[in-house]
Amino acid sequence: MPAQIKAADSYNKDKKGSITINLDDVKQGDSITNKSGVSVSIYQVASIGHDGVNISFDIASSLESTGVDVNDITTSDKNLNPAKKLTTVIDNSGISSVTKKTDSNGKVSFTDLAQGMYLVEEKDSASYGMFSPFLVAIPYMEDGQNWIYDVETYTKGVSNQQGSLEVTKALVYMDPETGKIYNLQAPKSYEEN
């Protein structure tokens, strides 16, 4: 994502925006997980400021203590780390969310959104997997000339299937003189009458 403070010569302060999220296929074993019915929430974490020349994002006062600089999101790392930090406090921030479920193609759209910075977070993966939270700016400038108010994202989900681990304990003794290893068996338990 390019720098968020840009010349605002073509900027329209009254224009609403949208965020469309497309879930990527996630392999789980030999199959692809179901992208339908995944709950996705968005939170407006910053409003937009416009001084007639430039725009900037002003983080919500309830999130100021996080130290997140929403105007310094220029790389995926600078997006991912602040987004993860914000998810740890967002539920207690007083900021309300809008939550929707993905359609059968793994797509969900949030429309008629005020300009600002939004935190996107998966709330319930259903049987999909999971994706990392991320931040989306409305608007943003991709080519250095035109503002984009309708943002479309493609997530890279990962499987949330956990592997299994089997632990086998063995009681062994190694004779220090010969180096020979002996398998020992503990006595069988018995019941007292």
Question: Which sequence ranges carry the predicted segments?
Answer:
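Solvent-exposed loop/turn and edge beta-strand elements of beta-rich ligand-binding domains
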Residues: M1-N193
